[in-house]
UniProtKB/Swiss-Prot annotation:
Methyltransferase recorded as keyword: no
PANTHER family the record matches: CHALCONE--FLAVANONE ISOMERASE 1-RELATED, CHALCONE--FLAVONONE ISOMERASE 1-RELATED
Cross-referenced InterPro entries: CFI, Chalcone_isomerase, Chalcone_isomerase_3-sand, Chalcone_isomerase_bundle_sf, Chalcone_isomerase_sf
Enzyme class: isomerase
Keywords, comma-separated and alphabetical: Flavonoid biosynthesis, Isomerase
GO biological process, one term: flavonoid biosynthetic process
Pathway in which the depicted protein is active: Secondary metabolite biosynthesis; flavonoid biosynthesis
Protein name per the record: Chalcone--flavanone isomerase
Function: Catalyzes the intramolecular cyclization of bicyclic chalcones into tricyclic (S)-flavanones. Responsible for the isomerization of 4,2',4',6'-tetrahydroxychalcone (also termed chalcone) into naringenin.
Originating organism: Canna generalis (Canna lily)
């Protein structure tokens, strides 16, 4: 597949702006904004937004996903769990930015992530001591943190070696290095899956990724095509 650098407009979720490209901490690459959305819960019959989430992908994602998914509509992609599985398990770098709209403690956030990841692993029959250890490292990294509105948790999902770089971003320009690196392919994939997977916590981000990637893939020429 012929491929040039992917360029898409920024996205604004509430008061949070996600730029069209980002250079994640711990990475030498610039990734494009694949989609963004909010995460919230209905409380007393009102929908309360807690976080805004942006998902970035390496350009390699386009040539990797294209042969299988080119020509599908946004609705086709949004309703196909295999499409999103190809994203969070794909051999390309991903970056997830989670910006607080409501204040959260590190303990609150990490316990919810643990709940989602462990439930997924147990359902898949893949929960082992290695996954349990990775989650404990994640909880340890977050436990003393506080996240007022406007602060962000950054996840760099690296491929080689398979690892998850965790960064806490409070103000100014994006940090170049992370706070913690956890060498766990399973945790790296599970965190992104918990956001845009079959039971993902941000349906808005999921729809946004489907819409933007449908448009990108439609514009890309497959190798050998005229």
């Amino acid at each position: 597949m012929a491929q040039a650098g992917v360029s898409l407009p920024k996205l604004v979720i509430g008061e949070v702006t996600f730029p069209p490209a980002a250079a994640p901490p711990g990475s030498s690459s610039s990734l494009f904004l694949a989609g963004a959305g909010e995460r919230g819960l209905e409380i007393d019959r009102q929908f309360v937004v807690f976080t805004a989430i942006g998902v970035y992908l390496e350009d390699l994602a386009v040539s990797t996903l294209g042969p299988k998914w080119k020509g599908k509509t946004a609705d086709d992609l949004a309703g196909n769990s295999d499409f999103f599985r190809d994203i969070f398990t794909g051999p390309f770098e991903k970056f997830t930015r989670i910006t607080m709209v409501k204040p959260l403690s590190g303990q609150q956030y990490s316990e919810k992530v643990e709940e989602n990841c462990v439930a997924h692993w147990k359902a898949a029959g893949t929960y082992t001591e290695a996954e349990a250890a990775a989650v404990e490292k994640f909880k340890e990294a977050c436990k003393n943190e506080t996240f007022p509105p406007g602060t962000s948790i950054l996840f760099t999902h690296q491929v080689s070696p398979a690892s998850l770089t965790i960064t806490f971003w409070r103000e100014g320009s994006m940090p170049e290095t992370g706070n913690t690196v956890i060498e766990s392919k399973a945790l790296s994939e599970a965190i992104l899956e918990s956001i845009i997977g079959k039971h993902g916590v941000s349906p808005g981000a999921k729809r946004s990724v489907a819409q933007r990637l449908s448009e990108i893939l439609e514009e890309v020429k497959l190798e050998g095509s005229k």
